[in-house]
């Protein structure tokens, strides 16, 4: 199957230049690229679809280029509202190294069709202002640039600086440089990048007469229509496990709504059309089993954190709800699992009772409620039922010397952390 046909059944083509011409070009191996600016020290879930697209093309025999925006990161792609904060060179360089490591886990840099990683600072920083205006700027109409949606929105509100206004020219020049050096003929990106990407197609045509192509992926939203990738805490869902634990990552996809889970399986996984059709039947006929969500969570955690992490977080989920041993969890997995809960911190030297712990962790609101919970058999510490109101933990009960998992009933739990 031609890669373009594959992308079409998956619903992964939002906009493109001449699709028939692109399909014909992809009958033979091509070189394509996607750029990532180092505006943070980690990529996030919003970057996933284009990153996975690079792998899809590579597995179909095409050569991907990952472009790290060492130059464009200093400028910042215009947002709908407000100027971006300028980043220092040290910050840019730190972010670049972090992002490069993450990109290397998505595409192969050896074997067949090995990927290439480039930094647009290599050609942008050495270009003089005169050369840039003469060789790039002269090929752009101000009317066309002003017609870009993001630019129009900014001009209608708080305006836009010349710096950010020029961003599309820098990105267009990237495409020209990659076409010259690597015969790169396709740029892919998110739906909000369409204007910048077609600027590169136009610039290639004007400076060398070369026919190149553009393709953007759909905007991904959750079941509530909110921008994809927001964690339950309201922040971004990061690829860096230090920022978003593997457990939180898994839980995000496990909680995907029925209305979006099949799209997510098409967009984010490498499952076949037949496998996804079977899961679609499960959603329609047995939604309460959440088979599609579980498979999605497994596939996405495998992809970003590795299979061992998937096994660990599934064990953690079982352990938190009393279906497996908490003692089998390593400290990082336990910490990640409890990061989604209330953490009650116990100062060094204090020895609270089970009643104090239940109240402190917010599982009950009074001593009377705590006593009733204990009497009714609903108080658990590390999945062991507590039957005495006077119970206090001893050192041998603490997980990794510092933690307790406190549970009320079947589903309400919290973490207790003892200070050293």
UniProtKB/Swiss-Prot annotation:
SUPFAM superfamilies: Alpha-L RNA-binding motif, Nucleotidylyl transferase. GO terms for cellular component: cytosol. One of its GO terms (biological process) is tyrosyl-tRNA aminoacylation. A motif ('KMSKS' region) lies at residues 227-231. L-tyrosine binds at residues 33, 167, 171. ATP binds at residue 230. Its EC number is 6.1.1.1. It catalyses: tRNA(Tyr) + L-tyrosine + ATP = L-tyrosyl-tRNA(Tyr) + AMP + diphosphate + H(+). Gene3D superfamilies: HUPs (3.40.50.620), RNA-binding S4 domain (3.10.290.10), Tyrosyl-Transfer RNA Synthetase (1.10.240.10). Residues 352-418 form the S4 RNA-binding domain. Coiled coil: none annotated. InterPro entries: aa-tRNA-synth_I_CS, aa-tRNA-synth_Ic, Rossmann-like_a/b/a_fold, S4_RNA-bd_sf, SYY-like_C, Tyr-tRNA-ligase, Tyr-tRNA-ligase_bac-type, Tyr-tRNA-ligase_bac_1. It is found in: Cytoplasm. It is an enzyme of class 6 (ligase). It holds the Pfam family tRNA-synt_1b. PROSITE patterns: AA_TRNA_LIGASE_I, S4. A motif ('HIGH' region) lies at residues 38-47. NCBIfam families: tyrS. Catalyzes the attachment of tyrosine to tRNA(Tyr) in a two-step reaction: tyrosine is first activated by ATP to form Tyr-AMP and then transferred to the acceptor end of tRNA(Tyr). HAMAP family: Tyr_tRNA_synth_type1 (MF_02006). Belongs to the class-I aminoacyl-tRNA synthetase family. TyrS type 1 subfamily. This is Tyrosine--tRNA ligase. It comes from Corynebacterium diphtheriae (strain ATCC 700971 / NCTC 13129 / Biotype gravis).
